A protein has these predicted regions:
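Long, terminal "pre-/pro-" and other extracytoplasmic accessory regions
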Residues: 2-268, 280-293
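Short proline/glycine-enriched turn/loop motifs at strand-loop junctions of beta-rich domains
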Residues: 271-274
Length: 293
């Protein structure tokens, strides 16, 4: 369920490595397009919230579909590609009646109730999340469903949430789908690095106006060869915050080592963070936020 989040980190690391290998001063963030992009991200998120019917109390991050166990050699190639293509169907009738509201629990003990998908609705949700078509794949046939719980990542950090677990014909692997009904989701975008660095997490507090974001950048500060300093600026709406990270590189003659490092920068908000989500400027998707007590 964390496949996309991991992909985001890997992409950011590759971008940082590419920048580190450039000669001279790498291109800095272009402020006007970055602000336009931030407004577009906020608008897209508002549309997703409206489409979901409400500003959900729980917003999952990353993949909602997953698996328990590894595919057996005999079926692995087909089943992996079939799942990515959303080629999943129920071999027997599954319940179309939604269970009672479930509970999401965060690591600090905070809980909230959420409406849940019926088992058949979860199958349909998997079918509708096609990453890559597969014309020569055989369908994955589900024979049973069990409502359980499992770890998920949310805009408020790691949590335990209701999850549907599906038995599949001819394999011991179980398919899973986060059971939360109508989550707010947006498809990731890909834009140029000239609009700012991609962030992968944030930290702050509900009542605070300081928001620290984490990303992959140069290992050294800007007063050292090949080093960079970073500043962060928040672009805000009632529903979300987008953080623009601006690079301030050291003027360097020659090539720099192709090494990226975890860096942070802090933005000042115009209003306390509250229950707003934090969105990545590059992909337009939410990142996990660690909230101080």
């Amino acid at each position: 369920m964390a496949r996309k989040a991991a992909g985001r980190y890997a992409s950011a690391l590759l971008a940082a490595i590419a920048l580190a290998g450039c000669m001279g001063v790498p291109g800095a963030t272009d402020p006007a397009p970055a602000h336009q992009r931030a407004q577009a991200v906020l608008s897209k998120w508002a549309g997703a919230v409206a489409a979901a019917g409400a500003n959900a109390a729980v917003t999952p991050i990353g993949e909602l579909t997953g698996q328990v166990g590894d595919w057996e050699e005999a079926v692995g190639d087909n089943n992996k590609r079939a799942l990515m293509a959303g080629m999943v169907a129920s071999a027997t009738a599954l319940s179309e009646e939604a269970p009672q509201d479930g509970e999401v629990t965060w690591q600090d003990g905070t809980t909230t109730k959420v409406p849940l998908l019926a088992a058949q609705q979860a199958i349909v949700a998997i079918e509708n999340t096609t990453e890559a078509p597969c014309s020569d794949c055989s369908m994955l046939m589900v024979t049973d469903a069990r409502l359980t719980s499992g770890p998920i990542q949310t805009t408020r950090g790691p949590a335990t949430a209701p999850v549907w677990e599906f038995t599949v014909q001819d394999t011991a692997v179980k398919l899973t789908r986060v059971a939360i009904a109508n989550p707010v989701v947006v498809a990731p975008d890909e834009v140029g690095s000239g609009l700012g660095l991609s962030i992968d997490s944030a930290s702050g507090s509900v009542s605070g106006t300081e928001l620290t974001v984490a990303f992959v950048g140069a290992p050294d500060p800007g007063n050292m060869p090949c080093g960079e300093d970073y500043t962060a600026e928040a672009v805000e709406s009632d529903l979300a915050v987008v953080v623009i990270v601006t690079r301030h590189p050291h003027v360097t003659i020659g090539a720099c080592s192709a090494v990226g490092a975890r860096r942070t920068a802090t933005a000042t908000l115009a209003a306390p963070l509250g229950d707003r989500v934090v969105l990545d400027l590059q992909q337009g998707t939410p990142v996990p936020v660690v909230l101080a007590p």
